[in-house]
Amino acid sequence: MADFNQILTPGDVDGGIINVVNEIPAGSNHKIEWNRKLAAFQLDRVEPAIFAKPTNYGFIPQTLDEDGDELDVLLVTEQPLATGVFLEARVIGVMKFVDDGEVDDKIVCVPADDRNNGNAYKTLSDLPQQLIKQIEFHFNHYKDLKKAGTTKVESWGDAEEAKKVIKESIERWNKQA
């Protein structure tokens, strides 16, 4: 398998369209991660079923978040996407998140061309409020059985704030490359 970080760029960040590689399908409790050294997807662990992901979960190639991993993405779609699918996505916001004291922000996006529902989602406020609540609950509690209180959704930001986070992550990637 080719390394997504070698074949895909982050995308047109200023234009709000990014490349996303999906790791975990929405509804899955399998914590699948991209292993950069092996250029392969790896099952890290199986979470309790109650903590299945409320959205697809992936990353933006050629980025590094403050935790040392590629910048995470929450990708909202009607149906789960398979592990390894990559696509262009439209940035609609950012979830500011802390995991065990480390910044671990999540970019929120939808497919760039989703003629079913996604084209209607231009901002976070366009998403169903119940989905926002589910995302917050999930990320505030998914580690509770292991070590309660180690994760916290701190705030939500708009697409412009998300683009800043992406650009900072690209800078970190370029410094280590």
UniProtKB/Swiss-Prot annotation:
* Pfam families cross-referenced by the UniProt entry: Pyrophosphatase
What GO molecular function annotations does the UniProt record carry, in alphabetical order?
A: inorganic diphosphate phosphatase activity; magnesium ion binding
EC primary class? hydrolase
InterPro entries given in the database record: Pyrophosphatase, Pyrophosphatase_sf
Indicate which residues the UniProt annotation says bind substrate.
K31, R45, Y57, Y142
EC number(s) per entry = 3.6.1.1
User: Where along this sequence does the record place binding of Mg(2+) 1?
Assistant: D67, D72, D104
UniProt: Mg(2+) 2 binding residues: D72
GO CC term, one of those recorded:
cytosol
Looking up Gene3D superfamilies in the UniProt record yields: Inorganic pyrophosphatase
The record's keywords, sorted A to Z, are:
Cytoplasm, Hydrolase, Magnesium, Metal-binding
Task: Name the chemical reaction catalysed here.
Answer: diphosphate + H2O = 2 phosphate + H(+)
Q: Which SUPFAM superfamilies match?
A: Inorganic pyrophosphatase (SSF50324)
Cofactors needed by this protein, per the record, are:
Mg(2+)
Q: What does the entry give for GO biological process?
A: phosphate-containing compound metabolic process
Record localization: Cytoplasm
Family according to the record: Belongs to the PPase family.
Function per UniProt: Catalyzes the hydrolysis of inorganic pyrophosphate (PPi) forming two phosphate ions.
Q: Which HAMAP family match?
A: Inorganic_PPase
Note the subunit structure. Homohexamer.
Q: What is this protein called?
A: Inorganic pyrophosphatase
